[in-house]
């Protein structure tokens, strides 16, 4: 998959339609996109083709399925954000995030558990 995963909101909504219904026939995808996004068939196929070219989905034998899970996509998006915005420094990200939003004790405990698990 290409590194560039920057997407517009409509692409993301389209991806959610697929993730929530996969694997699905491309004709069913057109129906779902008409209902959920008010898209016409050509729009659905154009966006699908573009996201297939980016290695996120595949259309094989008329069936559409993801090549990466929603969780993997989120992980890659988060990693790219930290890399581009904070030069890859997770501590810098957490410092910036924590300075604007007060973390609850529960959130701090959860973060500490993640850090402790990474040390093992």
Labelled PLM ranges:
Residues 23-33:
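Short acidic, hydrophobic short linear motifs in intrinsically disordered regions
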Residues 45-49:
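Short, hydrophobic-biased segments on the C-terminal half of alpha helices
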Residues 52-62:
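A short, conserved structural fragment
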Residues 12-17:
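Pre-recognition alpha-helix immediately N-terminal to the DNA-recognition helix
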Residues 18-22:
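Short helix-to-turn junction characteristic of helix-turn-helix DNA-binding domains
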Residues 4-10, 62-80:
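Short, cationic-aromatic polyanion-contact patches
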């Amino acid at each position: 998959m290409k590194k560039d995963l920057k997407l517009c909101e409509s692409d993301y909504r389209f991806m959610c339609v697929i993730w929530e219904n996969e694997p699905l026939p491309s004709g069913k995808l057109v129906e779902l996109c008409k209902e959920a996004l008010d898209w016409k068939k050509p729009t659905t196929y154009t966006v699908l083709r573009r996201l297939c070219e980016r290695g996120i989905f595949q259309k094989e034998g008329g069936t559409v399925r993801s090549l990466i899970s929603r969780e993997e996509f989120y992980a890659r998006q988060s990693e790219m954000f930290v890399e581009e915005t904070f030069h890859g420094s997770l501590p810098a990200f957490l410092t910036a995030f924590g300075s604007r939003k007060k973390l609850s004790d529960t959130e701090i405990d959860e973060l500490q558990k993640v850090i402790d698990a990474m040390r093992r």
